[in-house]
Amino acid sequence: MDNGIRVKLVNYTKKPLETVTWAALISYWDEWETETFGRMSDKDVEMHLPRVLGYGHESILEHATLTFAIEGCSRVCSHQLVRHRLASYTQQSQRYIVLNPEDVEETFVIPSGIKEDPELLAEWKELMKKSIELYKKSVERGQHQEDARFILPQAVRTKIVVTMNLRELKHFLGLRACERAQWEIREVAWKMLEEIAKNDELRPIIKWAKLGPRCVQLGYCPEGELMPPGCWKRTGEKWKTLFEG
């Protein structure tokens, strides 16, 4: 189902895997050889990076950052996102942007379970329309947007720019790409992974750094009895398609 959430990788550290590999090798060199960065090749990356990450030396991942644009998620979702504090965020302001909605589902995220109940869906939409009407009426009567926004439900869609280093991104994906994560933040997490997979320069790091849910990172499901039936196999197969095609 299309929930109207869009994620785009808009920028990342130049030569990200070379940067991370070079930083790893610096640990073993007697001299400070900055010139060697310019000579880093794909062969050097393939020879050293998987091995170093395999040892668990993940601090080197902090030298590469990725910036994503996320649009159409709810503020329920963005509240979960910003709990990951080792990242940078810039979110669309409800104080300076006047909301001018034309359609309820374009303005608010409605869970699929609600959509499957026609009677309940009608009540939801009615309440959402009422909140929009009161918001617009408040602004028209001279109330500041920063006050009028109080009437809007958490379901209102938002836009947010997120920058994470690769190590924090791995932590984020470990928690939020899991099937037990809330469905909306899980969708965002997998869309971020898909954006990385589309990039030839970045794709190898998915496998080498095990960017994905914790079951992929650990080799077992840490949820124990809470693991959804069939999740282990289903998630593993989905993850492998990111770099195997």
UniProtKB/Swiss-Prot annotation:
Binds 4 FAD per tetramer. Each FAD binding site is formed by three monomers. GO terms for biological process: dTMP biosynthetic process; dTTP biosynthetic process; methylation. The active site is at R176. Its EC number is 2.1.1.148. Residues 5-210 form the ThyX domain. A motif (ThyX motif) lies at residues 83-93. It holds the Pfam family Thy1. SUPFAM superfamilies: Thymidylate synthase-complementing protein Thy1 (SSF69796). Its cofactor is FAD. FAD binds at S59, R83, H84, R85, Q91, N165, L166, R167, H171. Keywords: FAD, Flavoprotein, Methyltransferase, NADP, Nucleotide biosynthesis, Transferase. GO terms for molecular function: flavin adenine dinucleotide binding; NADPH binding; thymidylate synthase (FAD) activity; thymidylate synthase activity. It is an enzyme of class 2 (transferase). It comes from the Archaea. It catalyses: dUMP + (6R)-5,10-methylene-5,6,7,8-tetrahydrofolate + NADPH + H(+) = dTMP + (6S)-5,6,7,8-tetrahydrofolate + NADP(+). Pathway: Pyrimidine metabolism; dTTP biosynthesis. NCBIfam families: thyX (TIGR02170). Homotetramer. Belongs to the thymidylate synthase ThyX family. Catalyzes the reductive methylation of 2'-deoxyuridine-5'-monophosphate (dUMP) to 2'-deoxythymidine-5'-monophosphate (dTMP) while utilizing 5,10-methylenetetrahydrofolate (mTHF) as the methyl donor, and NADPH and FADH(2) as the reductant. This is Flavin-dependent thymidylate synthase.
